[in-house]
Design a protein with these regions (language model features):
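Nucleic-acid modification enzymes, centered on SAM-dependent nucleic-acid methyltransferases
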Residues: 1-52, 56-322, 329, 333-362, ...
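Short, contiguous acidic/charged loop-to-helix segments that flank catalytic cores in large enzymes
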Residues: 23, 348, 358-371, 394-400, ...
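Short, basic/hydrophobic alpha-helical segments
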Residues: 34-41, 374-385, 660-674
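Active-site proximal loops enriched in glycine and acidic residues that flank catalytic Cys/His/Asp
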Residues: 306-309, 328, 394-396, 420-421, ...
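Extended hydrophobic-aromatic, low-complexity segments
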Residues: 315, 323-326, 332-339, 391-393, ...
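C-terminal non-catalytic scaffold/interaction domains in large multidomain proteins
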Residues: 415-745
Length: 745
C-alpha cells in the first residue's frame, strides 16, 4: 500500500471551555465527522479503542454512527456519559442547590464552605469571600488573596490579614482528614499506598478538607443515579481546581507532571462549583448512550465498555466495526494519577484498580508510550479486518511522540495509507490499514531511505521546512521501505533509540542539508533546507498558498473561514499542509471578516485597483528620476541609470508578498541597488515570510523594501535630491520599526 497525501481536516475549536480541557488532548469539532463521511456509511459501527477524550465518540454518534468506546478510566467514562446526556442548566442548578442545602452539623454546607474563604475587603472593610489565594511554594503558605469586592468594586491582589492566615487551617485534625482521604484510595499495606500519599501533596489543607467534606455530603444524599452523576461531574471541576498545579500568574496551563509551581492559585471551591454550572458546555441534543452489552439504536449512539480493549475483543458476530477513530494522547502522569485519586474518592478502592499502574509509575517515556500503543493496536489488528481503516489524531506533536506512534503502528502490522501534518498546529492525522510483511533493509539502506524522504519533502515544499515535519517524513519513508520493525509481538526496548539515532544521522552527518533558525545545537529544531538548490520550478509553498487564497477570494467573494481552510487544505494535502498562522496572515493582509465570520477581499485589493497602483508606481519612479537627473528604463522592473548608462537602481513592483520570484532569481552580489515596492498592507505578510524563510531572508539582505505610500510621499517632495533620497529610502520599513536613515552611496 502507498501512503496517500490526505487533506488536513482543521475543524473548529470549541467556542466555550470544556470540562478538564487542560488535561484532555486538544480536539477540534468537525474533524471526525468529516473523516467518517468520506470513509464509512452512516449507521456503521465505529470503534474508539483508547477513549482518551469523550468528543470523538459524541461527534460520531451525532453524525449517525454507532460508536463502541473502550474506556478504562472511570473519570473519562463519567465525563462521556454526562456530556452525552446533555443536561440543561436548570438540572445542574437543582442538584447544586440540593447539595448546598445539605447539612454539616448545624449549618448548611454552602455556608460552611463559604466561611472558610471569608475575608475583609482592604478597600471598604466589607466581609466578602475571596476568589482565591496565591501560595508561595518555598514559604509553604498563601501570601496574597484575590479579591473582587461586590460592595465597592475593588479588584486586585492583596496581602493576607491575620484572620486570613488563621483560616488557612480548616476545622479538625488535618492528619486525620489526610489519612481518610488516602484510605479511600488504598490501604496502608498496598503497593499503591506510596503513590496515593505522594498525590495527596497536590492538595493544600483547606482544599483537601473541602473536597472531602463535599464528597461525603454527596454520598449522603438520596439521589437517583442520573442526578448523582451530575453532582459527581460537578465535583470533578472542584477536584481539578483544588490541586496546587495551577501556576500564578495564570497562563496556558497543561500540566503533565505532578509538580507544584513556585507560585500557585488556591481557588474558592464553592465558586468553582457555581461557575461550573454557569459555564457548562451546551449541546444541541442528548446522545443515546449505554454500557455493554446493551447497544445503541441504528440511527446512532454510544456503547461504553468500562475496561481495556483486550477484555472486550473479539466482539460477537454482527457487531463488527468498519472503522476506528481515536485521539492519541501524550503521556500525562498528572492526569492519570489524579484520575486514580479522584476515582477512589468518588467510588472507593475498587474504582482505582483499573488505574492502579498510574499510582505505581512516576515517569512515562516515549518507549513506554510506543509499547502501550502497540499493545492496543496489536489487539485491534488481530480482531478486525486488515482493510479496516483506523483514523489517528495525534495532537501536541513532538518528534518523540511521532516516533512512538510510527513504531507502534508498524510493529502492530499497520501501514500508513494516509497522512497529513500541520506543523504549527502540532497535529498529525494518520490513516492506518493492515499490510503484508515489509522486508527490513540494512542499516545504511535505512539511512538512505530516511534521507530521501526528507529531501523529497523539502523539494515538494520548495522552502525551508520545520524539523518536526521532516522528522515525520523520515519515519514515514522508513515505514514504507521496511526500516521500522513490522508486525512484531512486542517492541524491542531499544527501538526508539535506534530510530532516533538513525534519523539523527540524516540531519547531523548529512552534507545535503543545512539548518536555519534555532540557536540550539540539537538537530531537533530549526528549519532545514538543501545544501544544493532544489532546481524546482514551483514557487515556494508559502507563495502558492498566498496565490490560492487570493484567487479564492476573487472567485468566490464572501467565504467563511472554514470553507477557505477546506479548499486550501484540499489543494495542498499531506506534506504540503500549510501552517494555520500563514493562512491567518494571508487573510488579514488581503481581506476582512464581517460579523458572521465571512471573509471578503478588501476593495483596495481588487485586481483592477492594484494594477492601477502599479501603473502609478511607474509614473512616480519616472517623476523621481527626472528630479534626480536620472534616466528611467523598462517597466516592472524599472531601472534608474546615470546619464552614462550605469545602472544604479532596479525596482520591482509587487501587489503581493511573493518575493521569491525576484529575490531568488537575482545574483547575490551586484553593483546596483535593488528595491521591492509593495502595498503597505503587504508589509506584515512580507516580514513574516522573510522570518519563516531564512534562505529568502539571507538573499534579501542587500535589498530595500519601499511601500506604495512612502514612494508617493517621496515623489511629491519638491526638494528631493540624491542625498535626501538615500536618507529616506528606508525610513518606513516593512517591519514597522522606524530606522535611522542610511546613506547608500
Amino acid at each position: 500500500m502507498q501512503t496517500i497525501a490526505r487533506a488536513y481536516l482543521a475543524g473548529q475549536p470549541f467556542s466555550s471551555p470544556q470540562l478538564l480541557e487542560h488535561f484532555l488532548p486538544p480536539y477540534h469539532e468537525g474533524v471526525i465527522s468529516a473523516w467518517l463521511k468520506e470513509y464509512l456509511p452512516p449507521g456503521a459501527w465505529v470503534l474508539d479503542p483508547l477513549g482518551s477524550t469523550p468528543f470523538p465518540a459524541l461527534e460520531a454518534a451525532r453524525s449517525g454512527y454507532r460508536v463502541l468506546v473502550a474506556s478504562n478510566n472511570p473519570i473519562l467514562t463519567l465525563l462521556l456519559e454526562v456530556l452525552a446526556a446533555a443536561p440543561p442548566e436548570r438540572e445542574l442548578q437543582a442538584v447544586l442547590a440540593e447539595l448546598a442545602s445539605s447539612r454539616r452539623l448545624d449549618e448548611r454546607l454552602e455556608i460552611h464552605v463559604q466561611s472558610l474563604y471569608q475575608t475583609e475587603c482592604p478597600a471598604c472593610n466589607a466581609r466578602i469571600q475571596a476568589d482565591g489565594f496565591i501560595w508561595d511554594r518555598e514559604q509553604a503558605k498563601p501570601v496574597l488573596k484575590l479579591i473582587q469586592c461586590p460592595v465597592c468594586g475593588a479588584q486586585d491582589e492583596y496581602p493576607l490579614s491575620a484572620a486570613d492566615e488563621e483560616r488557612v487551617t480548616p476545622p479538625g485534625r488535618m492528619e486525620l482528614h489526610r489519612a481518610r482521604a488516602i484510605e479511600r484510595i488504598s490501604s496502608p499495606d498496598s503497593p499503591l499506598h506510596a503513590g496515593a500519599v505522594e498525590a495527596m501533596q497536590m492538595y493544600q489543607p483547606r482544599a483537601l478538607y473541602i473536597v472531602s467534606t463535599i464528597i461525603n455530603r454527596i454520598e449522603g444524599l438520596n439521589l437517583p443515579e442520573s442526578r448523582r452523576k451530575l453532582l459527581w461531574t460537578l465535583a470533578l471541576t472542584m477536584l481539578d481546581a483544588g490541586t496546587s498545579l495551577w501556576g500564578w500568574p495564570e497562563e496556558r496551563n497543561r500540566p503533565r507532571q505532578l509538580s507544584i509551581p513556585p507560585r500557585f492559585r488556591e481557588s474558592n471551591l464553592w465558586m468553582v462549583l457555581e461557575q461550573a454550572v454557569r459555564n457548562w458546555p451546551r449541546s444541541e441534543k442528548p446522545v443515546f448512550i449505554t454500557r455493554w452489552p446493551n447497544l445503541p439504536p441504528e440511527e446512532g449512539g454510544i456503547c461504553v465498555f468500562p475496561g481495556r480493549l483486550r477484555e472486550w475483543l473479539p466482539l460477537p458476530r454482527g457487531i463488527q466495526p468498519l472503522g476506528a477513530i481515536t485521539v492519541v494522547p501524550r503521556p500525562n502522569q498528572a492526569f492519570w494519577t489524579l484520575s486514580a485519586v479522584w476515582a477512589g474518592w468518588l467510588w472507593g478502592r475498587e474504582a482505582v484498580l483499573p488505574l492502579k499502574g498510574t499510582l505505581e509509575r512516576r515517569r512515562y517515556d516515549w518507549q513506554w508510550h510506543a509499547g502501550a500503543l502497540h499493545h492496543t493496536l496489536s489487539i485491534l489488528r488481530r480482531n478486525s479486518a486488515a482493510e479496516m481503516p483506523i483514523f489517528l489524531i495525534c495532537p501536541e506533536l513532538v518528534p518523540g511522540f511521532y516516533s512512538a506512534v510510527a513504531a507502534a503502528a508498524s510493529a502492530a502490522g499497520y501501514l500508513q495509507t494516509g497522512q497529513a501534518l500541520c506543523a504549527d498546529a502540532e497535529t498529525a492525522q494518520l490513516v492506518l490499514q493492515g499490510g503484508a510483511d515489509v522486508p527490513s533493509p540494512a542499516s545504511q539502506v535505512g539511512e538512505n531511505l530516511a534521507r530521501t524522504g526528507v529531501e523529497e519533502v523539502i523539494k515538494l515544499r520548495n522552502e525551508p521546512t520545520p524539523y518536526l515535519l521532516l522528522h515525520a517524513a523520515a519515519l514515514a519513508a522508513l515505514a514504507r521501505g521496511g526500516g521500522i520493525p513490522f508486525n512484531k509481538p512486542e517492541i524491542a526496548w531499544d527501538t526508539l533509540t535506534k530510530l532516533q539515532n538513525l534519523v539523527g544521522r540524516v540531519f547531523n552527518k548529512s552534507e545535503s542539508l543545512i539548518r536555519f533558525g534555532s540557536q540550539a545545537q540539537a538537530s531537533e529544531s530549526g528549519w532545514w533546507w538543501l545544501a544544493q538548490e532544489s532546481g524546482q520550478d514551483e514557487p515556494p509553498l508559502a507563495d502558492r498558498v498566498e496565490m490560492e487564497i487570493i484567487r479564492l477570494l476573487i472567485r468566490q467573494g464572501g467565504t467563511p473561514r472554514s470553507e477557505i481552510e477546506t479548499i486550501v487544505y484540499d489543494k495542498y494535502p499531506g506534506w504540503l499542509t500549510p501552517d494555520t498562522a500563514w493562512l491567518d496572515a494571508c487573510l488579514d493582509s488581503y481581506a476582512e471578516a464581517d460579523e458572521r465570520g465571512t471573509w471578503r477581499l478588501r476593495q483596495a485589493e481588487q485586481p483592477a485597483n492594484r494594477r492601477q497602483d502599479l501603473l502609478q508606481v511607474g509614473e512616480q519612479l519616472a517623476v523621481l528620476a527626472d528630479k534626480l537627473g536620472l534616466v528611467v528604463q523598462g517597466e516592472n522592473p524599472w531601472e534608474w541609470r546615470l546619464k552614462d548608462g550605469t545602472l544604479i537602481f532596479r525596482f520591482y513592483g509587487l501587489a503581493s508578498s511573493m518575493l521569491a520570484r525576484y529575490i531568488l532569481a537575482e545574483e547575490e552580489e551586484v553593483e546596483f541597488q535593488r528595491v521591492i515596492i509593495l502595498p503597505g498592507s503587504r508589509a506584515k505578510l512580507a516580514t513574516l515570510k522573510l522570518h519563516r524563510d531564512m534562505r529568502l531572508q539571507q538573499m534579501a539582505a542587500g535589498w530595500h523594501f519601499l511601500k506604495f505610500r512612502h514612494l508617493r510621499t517621496l515623489a511629491e517632495r519638491a526638494n528631493i535630491n540624491m542625498d535626501l533620497w538615500n536618507m529616506l529610502l528606508d525610513a518606513d520599513p516593512i517591519s514597522g520599526d522606524p530606522q535611522q536613515p542610511r546613506m547608500l552611496f
